[in-house]
């Protein structure tokens, strides 16, 4: 019998990997995971990977609301399968980022309370996941993503007691790569460590938030959520102020302008903002950030001398800083900063 590996796209954010044995003896069942003709369905040999569930704790603005019933059905299909041996949660299972700008993320509670409320809001989903853990037939593994990078292993364990967690280390708990048992050639991770907007940013804003590592993508997600709860049209939306590249020969200035063009493209063609950019609306109290910021604090601008500056993340835009940031995120192969900035719009 020849060992083989099959990759099948089940849904937009569901990527099951099937490690199986060729066998002509098929067992017909009603479970969709147990009727694949390429596999020997008499043994547990499939690894199912899902990600980006974005299970928020308030259905007024959570990204995943309308398809929760189908998700529960899918998870029960995994749970009752006789051929699935592992379910991997590949990041962004929780969502601490997609919260409207004027909303206190934790309300009057704590980060642990946020997890508890996320479970309550999505109780049927977590009931199935925890049943998978308790029954012990299928291994359940969790990998952090960018939208849930701020949660420690102990906090995730509140929602999923006993879940296997794949993290680079206790210090760098925001990233993780998982190699399933017996398949070292398979590497499963969320991928945010490679993304300029989403990789951890240590020492980026020490004056404002000492010890913080939340990247620029966090603030983008807050603005995006606010554009959903406070919508406007493209024509009526607040426009991004023009920023001129006055010194194109300066690599740092060029990178800052490229960063600006991404914000301009997104905020004029993807999400439409109905707020004044100088109004302090982004309440934080998350990840060692404590201030309330304006959108202008995130966007690049021309200083009095014509140079491009940013109030937050101003030191990120050199190749040297990007190299250091990649190393901090345990990236094995360095990339060019402008390629990384431009690539963020395509991921």
Feature map (PLM): residue ranges:
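Generic cytosolic/nucleocytoplasmic N-terminal low-complexity/intrinsically disordered segments
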Residues: 1-2, 21-22
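Sec-dependent signal peptide recognition
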Residues: 2-10
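C-terminal motif of bacterial Sec signal peptides marking the signal peptidase cleavage site
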Residues: 16-19
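Extended recognition/assembly regions associated with phosphoester-bond processing machinery
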Residues: 22-347
